[in-house]
């Protein structure tokens, strides 16, 4: 039997047994499931869960309670990053990568089987929260594994491009989630969606999980990781090494990620609530909604996925030429400006202005998200890379994404869209501080 060929690029080795198609599919499918889960949960939290799992005295309290369960996932993600990062760094990327997908997928499917508050009372809410924690632990190991499989199998000079493969799962997940919701609503109607049909998207994720498992089980470990296994291992746990020896890239990397997380959840959670809510006025005199139908908003969000996909792919091509840091600096400046212009897009209240808000916002998300799968792993050595990239990415999510929509809702009620925009801009400034002090990694050899 022929051994898999290896090509040498300096000190880095590429294993040609894992083809470009294998790497792209294995990494993209997992991220697609992650974002499919996040999208369907965010939509269900806005449209359904405030009625089915939370009994509140007013609509705003119900929405905040439902959105708070989004935060549970981000609280659990660092635990998943520690757990899966440890096994991924010590024993192998492949099996860890498979286990994180299984935990994430099972937790999502179980949500589709849960009884509601009317059936078992507070236990329905507790079970929903436990499923979100399970999703979070699985997701905590998922992205880091996908990023490492892509980057560690990339030839020299193409790590940025290979790193966009897992990131392209985001627009795929968005399209699938919104398409499923639109299709179910069109077939069964909004009342059925609220009562029982919301379960279908969660149950259907089993198809994506099966595809992901099939592809991932055929992968082999990258030579750069196999070489690291043969070296003496540090006595400290990978997590402890990350937060001590590599604290600077860990901390600065978190700051870099925060603006993108806040923007993402303002786009898919806050803007969804604002667009679909009735055009009422808060006690402070600010508009609380635009009155768009769920179908119109979902269609516009699906159209904006084109912008997300294009900018992710474009980032992969350009960051291998101009560098990750330069690209991210200009992108984050764009996010800061976008935050200040938020009222210009949403106060108008027209379909056209809402479309451009979503299209430009998703484009900026893609520009910032695309480079992360190469940039964050490049900050850490091979023996601590899974833990380092996963912890950095997921703790940033804890501080950025978990509270974004929860903070934005009362900000809008008390200070209007200007307050929400300033909140986004301040987070962009935090990310710019991180980018100012962090090092470029484009030409760094993985070791």
From Swiss-Prot:
Highest taxon, organism lineage: Bacteria
Keyword Transmembrane helix attached: yes
SUPFAM superfamilies: MFS general substrate transporter (SSF103473)
Mode of membrane association: Multi-pass membrane protein
Transmembrane portions of the chain: 29-49, 64-84, 97-117, 120-140, 168-188, 195-215, 250-270, 296-316, 326-346, 355-375, 391-411, 419-439
Gene Ontology terms for molecular function: transmembrane transporter activity
Short name of one Pfam family: MFS_1
Keyword Transmembrane attributed: yes
Single GO cellular component term: plasma membrane
Periplasmic face residues: 50-63, 118-119, 189-194, 271-295, 347-354, 412-418
Keywords, ordered alphabetically: Cell inner membrane, Cell membrane, Membrane, Transmembrane, Transmembrane helix, Transport
InterPro entries found in the cross-reference section: MFS, MFS_dom, MFS_trans_sf, MHS_symport, Sugar_transporter_CS
Ranges in the topological domain labelled Cytoplasmic: 1-28, 85-96, 141-167, 216-249, 317-325, 376-390, 440-447
Localization annotation: Cell inner membrane
Similarity comment: Belongs to the major facilitator superfamily. Metabolite:H+ Symporter (MHS) family (TC 2.A.1.6) family.
Name of protein: Putative metabolite transport protein HI_0418
The organism of origin for this protein: Haemophilus influenzae (strain ATCC 51907 / DSM 11121 / KW20 / Rd)
Organism phylogeny: Bacteria, Pseudomonadati, Pseudomonadota, Gammaproteobacteria, Pasteurellales
């Amino acid at each position: 039997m022929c051994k898999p060929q290896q090509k040498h690029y300096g000190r880095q080795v590429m294993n040609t047994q894992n083809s470009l198609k294998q790497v792209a599919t294995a990494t993209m499918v997992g991220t697609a499931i992650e974002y499919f889960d996040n999208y369907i949960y965010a939509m269900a939290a806005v449209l359904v869960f405030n009625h089915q799992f939370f009994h509140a005295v007013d609509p705003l309290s119900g929405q905040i309670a439902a959105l708070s369960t989004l935060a549970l996932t981000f609280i659990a993600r660092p635990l998943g990053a520690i757990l899966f990062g440890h096994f991924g760094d010590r024993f192998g990327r492949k099996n860890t990568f498979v286990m994180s997908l299984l935990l994430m997928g099972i937790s999502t499917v179980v949500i589709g089987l849960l009884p509601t508050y009317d059936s078992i009372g507070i236990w329905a809410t507790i079970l929903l929260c436990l499923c979100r924690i399970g999703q979070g632990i699985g997701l905590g190991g998922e992205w880091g594994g996908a990023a490492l499989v892509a980057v560690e199998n990339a030839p020299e000079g193409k790590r940025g491009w290979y790193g966009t493969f897992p990131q392209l799962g985001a627009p795929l997940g968005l399209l699938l989630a919104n398409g499923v919701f639109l299709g179910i609503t069109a077939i069964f109607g909004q009342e059925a969606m609220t009562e029982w049909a919301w379960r279908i998207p969660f149950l259907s994720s089993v198809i994506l999980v099966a595809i992901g498992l099939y592809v991932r089980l055929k992968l082999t470990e990258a030579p750069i990781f196999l070489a690291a296994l043969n070296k003496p291992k540090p006595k400290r746990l990978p997590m402890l090494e990350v937060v001590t020896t590599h604290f600077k890239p860990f901390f600065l990397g978190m700051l870099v990620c925060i603006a993108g997380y806040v923007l993402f959840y303002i786009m898919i959670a806050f803007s969804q609530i604002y667009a679909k809510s009735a055009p009422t006025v808060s006690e402070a005199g600010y508009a609380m909604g635009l009155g768009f139908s769920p179908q119109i908003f979902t269609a516009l969000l699906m159209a904006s996925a084109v912008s997300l996909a294009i900018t992710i792919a474009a980032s992969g091509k350009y960051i291998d030429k101009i560098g990750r840091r330069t690209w991210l600096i200009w992108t984050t400046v764009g996010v800061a400006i976008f935050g200040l212009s938020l009222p210009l897009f949403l106060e108008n209240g027209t379909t056209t202005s809402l479309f451009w808000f979503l299209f430009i916002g998703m484009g900026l998300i893609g520009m910032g998200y695309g480079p992360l799968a190469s940039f964050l792993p490049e900050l850490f050595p091979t023996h601590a890379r899974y833990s380092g990239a996963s912890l950095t990415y997921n703790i940033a999510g804890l501080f950025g994404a978990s509270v974004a929509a929860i903070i934005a809702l009362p900000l809008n009620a008390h200070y209007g869209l200007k307050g929400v925009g300033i909140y986004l801009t301040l987070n962009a400034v935090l990310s710019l501080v991180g980018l100012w002090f962090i090092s470029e990694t484009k030409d760094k050899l993985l070791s």
